[in-house]
UniProtKB/Swiss-Prot annotation:
Organism field: Methanocorpusculum labreanum (strain ATCC 43576 / DSM 4855 / Z)
One Gene Ontology term of the molecular function aspect: nicotinamide-nucleotide adenylyltransferase activity
EC number: 2.7.7.1
Enzyme class at the top of the EC tree: transferase
Protein name: Nicotinamide-nucleotide adenylyltransferase
Keywords on record: ATP-binding, Cytoplasm, NAD, Nucleotide-binding, Nucleotidyltransferase, Pyridine nucleotide biosynthesis, Transferase
Pathway annotation: Cofactor biosynthesis; NAD(+) biosynthesis; NAD(+) from nicotinamide D-ribonucleotide: step 1/1
Location of the protein in the cell: Cytoplasm
GO BP term (any one): NAD biosynthetic process
Pfam families reported in the protein's UniProt record: CTP_transf_like (PF01467)
Disulfide partners: none
Amino acid sequence: MRRGLYVGRFQPFHNGHKAVIDGLAEEVDELIIGIGSADISHDIRHPFTAGERVLMITRALNGLKIPFYVIPLEDVKRNALWVAHVKSMVPPFDTVYTSNPLVIQLFKEAGIPVLSPPMYLRESLSGTAVRKKMYHGEAWEEYVPKEVVSVVGEIHGIERMQQISKSD
């Protein structure tokens, strides 16, 4: 059995993430989705809580053809210890999938195979681009699964984002 670990912040979970996961479902038998920076929320780069991101991802992946686990991963203040922390928090895995340069380096140094899945429409489908649209009141809904639109509405996410982006 092949089990992969896909690590990202998912702020928010968007169609690019979904496309990567759909592709990974063809490569692995089970997928662990590690929500990075799970301890940070309510700021410009991290507007959503770990629990809100779990909800977004779980709903958006309902019907995925392989079993998956969504696990929040808190940051640690020493990067050299982060891989050991991750390994203690998730089921055993064979390969890490990420495009984050730091995450790639840390897992490679630990001797764990790392693959960078191809990014899907990276110019328009990045968390930064989607958040920018959300902050500025622009159309963002087409860039995320419909289930994410629902979660953002339930938690009043746009209002939160616009409030925390104000300066005093």
